[in-house]
């Protein structure tokens, strides 16, 4: 790592702490040449291959997950912080798997699990895009499963 101020390569770590809100390690560093101090965050790199519907493999991209969550939760009570928290939870679930290969179907099911707990409108919006309903009957099944005992919610 280079100092962002003078590009010198010799740094010393002054302080190191867990940053639990972002599953990262926060480090305070000092450049040994210019004595400037700065903060860095270290996170685990997720090396998971995603199997796409067409059979291709692609590296997992958290930004795609966050964008999908944002689209589903637009104009709902889910805020940016909760979107990030859900994405972080899903990422942790993926890291916990033994297999470093996951299908888009498995990722979609994880998203649905977390959105169902967070906000029903976001859950249904995501389900409409993710499940690619062919008719209204399929949508009705999701709507009925989203409410307790299939009852109407007001």
UniProtKB/Swiss-Prot annotation:
Record's cofactor remark: Binds 1 zinc ion.
GO-annotated molecular function: ATP binding; double-stranded DNA binding; zinc ion binding
ZnF region ranges: unnamed: 3-34
Function recorded in the entry: Negatively regulates transcription of bacterial ribonucleotide reductase nrd genes and operons by binding to NrdR-boxes.
NCBIfam families: transcriptional regulator NrdR
Protein family membership: Belongs to the NrdR family.
PANTHER family hit by this protein: TRANSCRIPTIONAL REPRESSOR NRDR
Name assigned to this protein: Transcriptional repressor NrdR
UniProt organism field: Chlamydia trachomatis serovar D (strain ATCC VR-885 / DSM 19411 / UW-3/Cx)
């Amino acid at each position: 790592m280079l100092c962002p101020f003078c590009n010198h390569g010799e740094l010393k770590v002054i302080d190191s702490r867990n940053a639990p809100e972002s599953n990262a390690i926060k480090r305070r560093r000092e450049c040994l040449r210019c004595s400037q101090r700065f903060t860095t965050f270290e996170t685990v790199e997720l090396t998971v291959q995603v199997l796409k519907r067409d059979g291709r493999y692609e590296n997992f991209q958290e930004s795609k997950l966050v964008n999908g969550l944002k689209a589903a939760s637009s104009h709902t009570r889910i805020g940016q912080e909760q979107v990030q928290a859900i994405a972080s939870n899903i990422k942790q679930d993926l890291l916990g798997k033994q297999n470093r290969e996951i299908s888009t179907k498995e990722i979609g099911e994880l998203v649905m699990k977390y959105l169902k707990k967070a906000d029903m409108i976001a859950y249904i919006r995501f389900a409409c895009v993710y499940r690619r309903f062919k008719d209204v009957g399929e949508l009705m099944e999701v709507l009925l499963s989203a409410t307790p005992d299939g009852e109407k919610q007001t």
